Amino acid sequence: MWRIWRCRLSFLFATGCLLGALTAGLGSQMSDSVGRNVQAPAGVADASQEAGDVVEERTERTEEQAFALGPPRRHSSESLFPRNASVTARRRRNRRIALIATAVGVAVILAAVYVLRRRRAQRPQDPEPPAPRSVEDPEVLPEEDEASSSLPPPPPPSPPPPPPVEDPLSPESQTVDLSCLSGTTVRFFGPSHHFGGFTPLYDPAPDKRVATVDAGANALFIGGGGLNGQFAKTLLEEAEKHGIRLTPEELSQHSQRIQQSLLRRAVKSPGKLVELDTGVASPVFARSFGFVPVVPGLMWEESEVGPNVGVTFVHILKPEVTPYGNLNNNVMMYTVAPSGAAPDKTYSLAYKTTIAGVIGAAAAYNDTPAGQQYPVQGLRLPLLGGGIFRRNRSLESIGRANAEGTSLAITRYGPNFELQYMYDPSNAALHGLQEAESTYLASMLD
């Protein structure tokens, strides 16, 4: 910094000196030029000798007048050159300008010398390095790398978009604790604002991990109509959102192939959960499990109740097809209910086996390492067999079979889940459980 100031002051000093010299020379040159520009009268400038004689004659006259008596005789330069008033005024003005310019040059030089001396007297000293801060100083923080300090901080991650919200459930839904189910909490949904009051398969923001049960087909595929078709629609919509190319036919064939493979494994170990790692080969299932409480067709004729009745599958959905992207919605269950055309005793046995398969499969999954870490806490299910499988069977009889099968399954596998029944205009499940609760309480009084 001092070097820069010294260079600036040296340049100012030199400029002042040059300006003073130029202004002084300019004044002298202007005076001379004025003298040269004055023209002598005609006859005088042509003969320098005659001009000299005139001067000598004037000198002699002056001496004579000095010693002569009487008043002195006035004379002027008019005897040599006639006086010009404009030339005289111009000469005086130029002399003033020359004097002023000279004074300005001298002032600039003096100012430069004064500033130079003042700067030299106040020359700053190099600052001393700051003393190192104590380690005990609470404000001492670790220094950041130069590379990281030069870069701007990364922008905060944008918040995730809010999940789409479905129509709220009806306030008519109710929750009860039933003693006949060992205190299991049962929730009955009222009609929603969907067409026909249909209960959504999954909630946008569930407070627990709920597995929704699909009332599947005897051929073990996902698709078609009813609740099975609704599951296919949900999976296909989620896949499309994430750029997964999947057609209804491909989903139907893929799910059928996986579930048939699981069934072949499950019938070899009744009452045990079997697993099939589908993460690589499946576009929708990360892991899949199969469970049968008894071998299908062993205790009844499949020609009466239908094939594959009582088998249950548990599918862990991949994040790309999980409804609303919420991990509490990544469990799907699949079962096959008996045909309502079967005889009453056969139907009752097959129906109880189906309910036992659903609750038993969920309980067995919770016993696995993955289930222990992240267990299923609720089952959302329809009135199984109350759709196209009902045939001529009354809904009341289906409701009673559901209550009996649920009570037996909870007694066997434990009250580990909240049961959530989808909306049913007939309230057959509710009435069947209320009847079972009354019978149970009456038996406790005896």
Curated annotation (Swiss-Prot):
Question: Which intervals lie on the Cytoplasmic side per UniProt?
Answer: 118-446
What the record says about disrupting the gene is: Deletion of the whole MAF1 locus (which includes all a and b paralogs) causes a loss in tachyzoite parasitophorous vacuole association with host mitochondria (HMA) upon host infection without causing any significant growth defect to the parasite. Prevents the formation of SPOTs (structures positive for outer mitochondrial membrane (OMM)). Partially impairs the reduction in mitochondrial protein abundance caused by infection; specifically, prevents the loss of MFN1, MFN2 and MIRO2 proteins.
Ranges annotated as biased composition (Pro residues): 151-166
The Basic and acidic residues compositionally biased stretches are 55-64
Instruction: Please provide one cellular component term from the Gene Ontology annotations of this protein.
Output: symbiont-containing vacuole membrane
What segment(s) does the record annotate as region Necessary but not sufficient for host membrane association (HMA)?
Answer: 431-446
CDD domains noted in UniProt: MAF1-ALBA4_C
Q: Does the keyword Calcium apply?
A: no
Give ranges for the Vacuolar compartment: 21-96
How is the quaternary structure described?
Associates with the host mitochondrial intermembrane space bridging (MIB) complex. Interacts with host import receptor TOMM70; the interaction impairs TOMM70 import activity and enables the parasite to associate with the host mitochondria and then with SAMM50; the interaction is likely to be indirect. Interacts with host MIB complex component SAMM50; the interaction requires prior binding to host import receptor TOMM70 and is likely to be indirect.
Described purpose of this protein according to its UniProt entry:
During host cell infection by tachyzoites, required for tethering the parasitophorous vacuole to the host mitochondria. This process, known as host mitochondrial association (HMA), induces the formation of SPOTs (structures positive for outer mitochondrial membrane (OMM)), a cellular response to OMM stress, which leads to the constitutive shedding of OMM vesicles containing proteins such as mitofusins MFN1 and MFN2, which normally restrict parasite growth.
Name the record gives this protein: Mitochondrial association factor 1 form b1
From what organism does this protein derive? Toxoplasma gondii
